[in-house]
Amino acid sequence: MKTIGMLAGMSWESTSLYYQLINREVQARLGGVHSAKALMYSFDFAEIAALQNAGRWDEATVALSDVGRMLAGGGADFLMICCNTMHLMAEAVERAAGIPLLHIADPLGAAIKARGLRRVGLVGSCFTMEKGGIVIDRLRARFGIETIVPEADERAEIQRIIIEELCRGRFLDSARATHRGVFERLVARGAEGIVLGCTEIPILVGPEDASVPTFDTTTLHALAAVEMALR
């Protein structure tokens, strides 16, 4: 079994889900009391969020690259960034660490393609929805999948919910209702599926909240990490 290097804590709410998903899948596949071999570095998300909000992406890249090198030096065989947004610097982290990085968009794209879909709605942080280099460009280039995002006011409200509620462990019915409305408006604009493109959002909503297939990036990423670890 390979050792997974997890760049985590962005936020810890979704990191706890990643850890459960990965270990449950390893145990399901191997049986007994097996669990994943993993090294985890948990960031103080307040520091990362401050860099995001200030547009200091170069500093964020340095921070994640340093941790990637540290995990590689500690024995990790490959890396995963447990956050959609911070895949903006995925290639830089992979270069710095010198070991493979499992990009969150790759298992996502494979899952969408397996369902035969070509156009999906993306819901995530404002950065993920607005910066093509995180998920949108990779889905188009590697899988031929078109992505549409909510309107500007909806993106702002989703970002508020993520930071003020989800990352603080508050999963409210009002936020669930907001997301359901956004999903249906994306479907009305032609979305054939909905990408839950923030690692906290799948804790709030699931397949029952949309009229089209949903794609949970957290679960897809975690299961792909197990597949890579056991290959």
Enumerate the predicted regions with their spans:
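Non-catalytic structural scaffold of enzyme domains
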Residues: 1-231
